[in-house]
Each structure stands twice: as structure tokens, then as C-alpha cells.
């Protein structure tokens, strides 16, 4: 539908910036479990990486000794907050893929009153990602 939210999105993009315990193991988790790819790590020892899948980019930065990881659910555990909402073409297919790879599904797939079909996963650092498709397309 031409009037849907997804169709009206400008051609801009955004990349969530996640502070993680271990950049290398997190990048490998995103590759092996969530189907993302990466080309390189920055610095030695590695302290930064960008993972990509179908145009989605997530930045991973090494937790400094004085820093604190803070997934949104840590700030508001009752709020059901996501750290990222990722628009996809087929939620059912991706949900099946993730389940076959042992990804932790924190909310199973369902149709939402806001016109999307989506589900939530939790990554190896506790970040919550929601993957959803626009039902009006």
C-alpha cells in the first residue's frame, strides 16, 4: 500500500550502537545465529565492528572497563523496550530461520494492532531486537 509507514520512509538509515562485552564473540554471534556479515574489526585488540544484513547495520563497540552495558530492558524491564526495531519482508520465514539456529525468541511471532507482524529476540549481550513486517504491503 503506497500510504503505509514503510513506503513513506525517507531513504535515510540509522545504525544502533551497542556496547558489548566482547566485540569478536558478539560479531560472530550475529553472523552465526542472526545471519549478519562483517568485513573487519577495528583496532588491536578489536574494539569495534559493524555487522550487516540486507541493508541493516548494527555497530558493536567494546565495553571499556569503566563503561556499563545498558540494553533498554535494563533501564525499564517492565516497559518491553526494544533496542532496535528492524523492518523485514517476511517475518514468518525469518522467525523459522532464527528458531532453527537456536536464537533466543523472547516474544513469538504475532500480528500487532499497529499493523505489523513481528517477534522479539535477545542477543548474546541481552539486547532486544524486534523483527517485523508491515502487513499493509
Which positions does each model-derived feature cover?
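Major-groove DNA-recognition helix of helix-turn-helix-type DNA-binding domains
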Residues: 34
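Conserved beta-strand-loop-alpha-helix junction that forms the acyl-donor binding cleft
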Residues: 20-22
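Vicinal oxygen chelate
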Residues: 2-17, 37-89, 95-122, 132-137
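Conserved active-site tyrosine of GNAT-family acetyltransferases
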Residues: 26-31, 98, 123-126
Amino acid at each position: 500500500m503506497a500510504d503505509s509507514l514503510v513506503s513513506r520512509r525517507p531513504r535515510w538509515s540509522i545504525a544502533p550502537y551497542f556496547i558489548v562485552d566482547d566485540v569478536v564473540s558478539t560479531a560472530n554471534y550475529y553472523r552465526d545465529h542472526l545471519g549478519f556479515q562483517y568485513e573487519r574489526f577495528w583496532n588491536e585488540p578489536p574494539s569495534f565492528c559493524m555487522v550487516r544484513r540486507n541493508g541493516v547495520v548494527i555497530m558493536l563497540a567494546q565495553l571499556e572497563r569503566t563503561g556499563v552495558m545498558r540494553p533498554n530492558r535494563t533501564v525499564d524491564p517492565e516497559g518491553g523496550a526494544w533496542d532496535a526495531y528492524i523492518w523485514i519482508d517476511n517475518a514468518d520465514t525469518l522467525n523459522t530461520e532464527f528458531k532453527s539456529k537456536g536464537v533466543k525468541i523472547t516474544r513469538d511471532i504475532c500480528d500487532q494492532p499497529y499493523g505489523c507482524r513481528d517477534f522479539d529476540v535477545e542477543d548474546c549481550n541481552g539486547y532486544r531486537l524486534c523483527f517485523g513486517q508491515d502487513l499493509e504491503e
